[in-house]
């Protein structure tokens, strides 16, 4: 049997009334594809028949009506009169007089469909799940199942989630369902067997790039009339590829490029020759490929010495410079050489956008305070311009996720579908994964818990390409990084925005959890909002407190609070590690009902007094006849370590038999070591595994003076190891011990309070021993089920674990 094909949903330059506001504002038509070009491309791509389905117009189809194997069609915007819902109905193989009659009836879809059946006009409902004006609902879909006998189940601009659902929807119908819907809506269905629907496909191409990407196929119908009859009889099927955000975005770019060339011609190409070369390579729909002199000029410019020093350059010059560097990057070009057009365009656009956004964001962050308001405004405005240039992707990702709520409602309204819910997949966004801090430790434990419980969890982060690959972690290569002055070893990596968005779309994540409010976390929030994905977050770190501690600047502290409250208020729920943190956030304006406790504890089998080794600290030069005070964590000022140095030296000077052990590292280490010169102390750097466990258990007491920690895993680890703990009365650690039972609480910021607390224990060995035992018992008694510790983040109660 021979098959015959046609793209039954494709647009030409006669689709000139765009639906998007920005395109209407600048009088940009929906398509620049000439009918003759469309015809030629469709035939070259294997289409046996060609039609054009412009919006409410047959002018494009009329232009090629004299060519072989063509027929006149149109995409009609029809209205459900009861609520004004717009739907698109494609009418096939019509006459001019029929088109005029259809246009007169389209304000009432019932009257229009009755006319189509009376005239025996083949027609189908295009992209049935796409809401044109926000009024599409289950009732309209149910009525459409009665009105239409043929449905577009493969639209070349729509993602598989919608195309596939549409196919399952119309395939699940039976006589009982149709009868029930007919009774419910008092509407007589069309067709002899209205539960058996015809299925077609079309590219829905507007930019000329994806003509025939999706199409309709029938068997043994070598004539137009035979092809149309096969569709009427339900003997057709949809073929080709589904679409998605990239297809939609690149169609918009194709239209924009044609608009640019039409309005500006060659006036601007001289200023940006490399950008023009890229655009022409991907989007030029005609035969014009640039003159010989243009190619010679481009070759000469391309081979001149290049530089990434953009000082003093305009935006256009920087953009063209980056395009030139890209065109000269043979490794990059080779990597995308065999990719399809969508992947090539996306890779190029993403790379250019990343470089430009990073450049201007870096400039904004490094502007001096006296740069002036307009300099800040200009730089911020340029960042906005770059986002505007890549807004077709934002628009496409957003539109490809509209309708998910409708799908959920339809699965309830039509249980006959036996719709299988998508597997829950969580993407956890974090700016830190490689450190020894509490956030990184928690995330690594989450990965392990998720794996053991059969939960699909992927941690999203950004970093250097050379960093080690960790199972369960998707590390995107950082476009660049911002180094914080007070944290020289702590970088904020700038993630590749579009690449991360595309990954989330491609993998089909159903939930996003944000662990940090940095650049990666902010991108996670943007994606969640753009793609209508449920989002939650964890408040791990008291950023405003850190800002205050590091800068002593009240304005910056308030700015940090404003950002944090805005950031977390965008989420459906926020997990907080302590009651104190919850009250602090509530007082700053975060709604109480959004906050939930984050249950965390410590593995008491890993951290245990049994790991004690009397020679552990003695072999490191401390502990010889002295009581070992231990601190574990980041060595930085905001941890209260200046106060610890002052208290420790005062105690030693007064004759106290103590030594100080520091496990950890950070920007304050060198200065702290200098200040402790001549005193019994030992800095080990970061320890892990058994060495860390023995370091805890082999000390005598644990001192944690920080007032900025929201939780404090180390306080639990110390108590599990049998150490009494000394903590401040501010922050989360205070809630992880019992004052007077497992340790002592002192007033935050008080050197005297810390001195008195240490002295109370070292002068009463029996008390110190009793508190250490109480601390161990406390962690054993209060430890939750280890399997349930991370349920809140992983939503394990909602998963069917394997």
Where are these regions (language model features)?
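Nucleotide-activated donor-binding/catalytic signature segment of Leloir-type glycosyltransferases, i.e.
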Residues: 670-690
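Domain-core and long-helix interface of multi-subunit machines
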Residues: 3-29, 96-217, 240-244
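A short, well-ordered alpha-helix in the C-terminal region of glycosyltransferases
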Residues: 753, 760, 767-781, 788
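Aromatic "clamp/platform" in nucleotide-sugar-dependent glycosyltransferases that forms part
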Residues: 707
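Carbohydrate-associated surface elements
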Residues: 463, 580, 601
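Conserved donor-binding/catalytic core segment of Leloir-type glycosyltransferases
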Residues: 428, 623-639, 645-649
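Short hydrophobic beta-strand element within catalytic cores of glycosyltransferases
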Residues: 724-727
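An N-terminally biased module of ancient metal coordination in phosphate/nucleic-acid-related enzymes
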Residues: 1-86, 209
């Amino acid at each position: 049997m021979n098959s015959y094909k046609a793209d039954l949903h494709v647009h030409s330059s006669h689709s000139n009334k765009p639906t998007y506001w920005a395109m209407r504002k600048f009088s940009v038509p929906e398509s620049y594809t000439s009918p003759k070009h469309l015809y030629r491309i469709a035939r070259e791509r294997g289409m046996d028949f060609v039609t054009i389905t412009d919006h409410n117009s047959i002018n494009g189809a009329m232009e090629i009506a004299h060519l072989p194997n063509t027929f006149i069609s149109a995409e009609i915007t029809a209205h459900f009169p009861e609520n004004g819902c717009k739907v698109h109905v494609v009418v096939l193989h019509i006459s001019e007089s029929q088109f005029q009659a259809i246009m007169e009836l389209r304000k009432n879809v019932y009257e229009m469909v009755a006319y189509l059946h009376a005239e025996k006009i083949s027609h189908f409902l295009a992209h049935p799940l796409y809401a044109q004006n926000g009024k599409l609902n289950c009732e309209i879909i149910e009525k459409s199942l009665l009105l239409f006998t043929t449905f577009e189940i493969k639209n070349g601009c729509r993602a598989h989630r919608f195309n596939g659902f549409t196919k399952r929807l119309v395939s699940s119908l039976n006589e009982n369902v149709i009868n029930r819907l007919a009774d419910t809506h008092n509407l007589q269905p069309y067709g002899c067997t209205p539960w058996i629907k015809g299925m077609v496909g079309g590219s829905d191409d507007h930019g000329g790039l994806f003509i025939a990407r999706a199409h309709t196929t029938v068997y043994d119908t070598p004539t137009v009339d035979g092809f149309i009859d096969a569709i009427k009889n339900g003997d057709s099927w949809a073929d080709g590829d589904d679409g998605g955000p990239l297809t939609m975005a690149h169609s918009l770019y194709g239209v924009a490029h044609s608009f640019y060339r039409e309005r500006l011609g060659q006036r601007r190409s001289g200023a940006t020759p490399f950008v023009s070369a890229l655009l022409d390579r991907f989007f030029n729909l005609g035969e014009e490929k640039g003159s010989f002199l243009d190619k010679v000029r481009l070759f000469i410019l391309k081979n001149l010495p290049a530089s990434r020093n953009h000082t003093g350059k305009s935006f256009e010059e920087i953009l063209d410079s980056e395009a030139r560097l890209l065109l000269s990057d043979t490794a990059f070009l080779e990597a995308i050489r065999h990719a399809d057009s969508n992947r090539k365009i996306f890779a190029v656009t993403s790379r250019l956008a990343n470089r430009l956004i990073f450049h201007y964001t870096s400039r904004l962050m490094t502007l001096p305070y006296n740069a002036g308001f307009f300099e800040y405004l200009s730089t911020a405005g340029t960042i906005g311009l770059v986002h505007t240039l890549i807004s077709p992707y934002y628009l496409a990702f957003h539109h490809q996720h509209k309708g998910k709520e409708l799908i959920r409602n339809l699965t309830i309204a039509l249980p006959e579908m036996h719709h299988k819910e998508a597997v829950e997949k969580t993407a956890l966004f974090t700016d830190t994964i490689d450190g020894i801090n509490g956030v990184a430790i928690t995330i690594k434990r989450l990965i392990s818990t998720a794996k053991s419980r059969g939960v699909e969890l992927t941690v999203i982060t950004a970093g250097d390409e050379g960093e080690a690959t960790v199972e369960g972690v998707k590390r995107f290569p950082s476009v660049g990084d911002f180094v914080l002055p007070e944290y020289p070893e702590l970088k904020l990596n700038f993630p590749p925005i579009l690449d991360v968005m595309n990954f989330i779309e491609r993998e089909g994540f159903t939930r996003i959890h944000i662990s940090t409010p940095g650049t990666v976390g902010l991108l996670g929030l943007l994606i969640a909002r753009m793609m209508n994905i449920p989002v939650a977050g964890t408040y791990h770190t008291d950023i405003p407190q850190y800002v205050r501690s590091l800068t002593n600047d009240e304005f910056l502290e308030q700015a940090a609070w404003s950002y944090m409250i805005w950031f977390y208020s965008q989420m459906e729920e926020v997990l907080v590690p302590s009651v104190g943190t919850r009250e602090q956030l509530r007082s700053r304006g975060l709604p109480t009902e959004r906050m939930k406790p984050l249950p965390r504890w410590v593995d008491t089998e890993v951290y245990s007094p049994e790991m004690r080794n009397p020679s552990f600290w003695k072999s490191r030069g401390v502990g010889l006849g002295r009581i070992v005070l231990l601190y574990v964590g980041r060595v930085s000022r905001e941890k209260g370590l200046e106060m610890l140095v002052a208290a420790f030296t005062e105690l030693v000077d007064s004759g106290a038999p103590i030594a100080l052990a520091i496990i950890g590292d950070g920007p304050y280490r060198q200065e702290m070591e200098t200040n402790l010169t001549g005193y019994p102390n030992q800095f080990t750097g970061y320890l892990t595994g058994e060495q860390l466990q023995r370091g805890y258990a082999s000390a005598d007491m644990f001192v944690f003076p920080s007032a900025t920690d929201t939780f404090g895993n180390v306080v639990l680890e110390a108590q599990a190891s049998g150490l009494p703990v000394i903590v401040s009365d501010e922050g989360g650690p205070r809630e992880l011990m019992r004052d007077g039972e497992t340790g002592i609480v002192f007033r935050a910021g008080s050197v005297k309070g810390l001195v008195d607390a240490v002295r109370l224990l070292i002068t009463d060995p029996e008390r110190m021993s009793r508190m250490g035992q109480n601390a161990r018992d406390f962690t054993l008694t209060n430890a939750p089920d280890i399997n349930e510790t991370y349920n809140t983040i992983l939503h394990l109660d909602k998963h069917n674990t394997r």
